[in-house]
Regions:
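Flexible, compositionally biased loop and terminal segments
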Residues: 1-169
């Protein structure tokens, strides 16, 4: 593993608008996170890209900007508490399904696999609710060094696992 100081610079990416026009035409862009923390020009660009891709169905590309799962879950709890206080819902109606429906990712399937690079063995406040039954694969290489070989290795490890979705048997 190379250190960050000796790693070549990652290639520069084109702007999202250029990417959409050059191959992302079938992808739906979704950005999750707190947009209030972002510059208004960035928010405008995000919203423009999301609008342009809203009807694309080949792939959902989800980018997390200014996202924290604890903050997301706190917002869900606050919103459900407000609805309970105003009588829109009763406390007894609140269940896993209702919470899931209130998440930013409510219309996206939960991940089957999380590949974590850099050798870190943690999920770092990322999709805490959504990763409940995901398989986790930890890769020692740093993100800029992650390549097809690393990806294939992670998929191979994932395919050898017996998924139990919370069952202990």
């Amino acid at each position: 593993m190379r250190s960050a100081l000796h790693r070549p610079s990652p290639p520069r990416l084109a702007s999202p608008t250029v990417l959409i026009g050059q191959g992302f035409a079938l992808w739906k862009l979704r950005v999750i996170g707190d947009r209030l923390d972002l510059n208004s020009d960035i928010v405008d660009l995000i919203e423009d890209c999301e609008r342009r891709t809203v009807n694309n169905t080949t792939l959902d590309l989800v980018i997390a900007l200014s996202y924290g799962s604890r903050k997301e879950l706190t917002n869900v709890v606050k919103n459900l508490a407000k609805k309970s206080v105003t009588g829109e819902i009763s406390v007894d109606e609140i269940d896993e399904s209702m919470i899931t429906q209130c998440l930013e990712t409510s219309d996206i399937p939960d991940p089957d696999l999380l590949i974590r690079t850099s050798g870190e063995k943690r999920i770092s406040n990322f999709l805490l609710w959504q990763l409940a039954y995901a398989e986790l694969v930890f890769i020692d290489c740093l993100w800029p060094d992650f390549n097809e070989t690393e990806f294939t290795s992670a998929i191979s490890e994932f395919s050898r696992r017996e998924r139990r979705f919370g069952s202990t048997v």
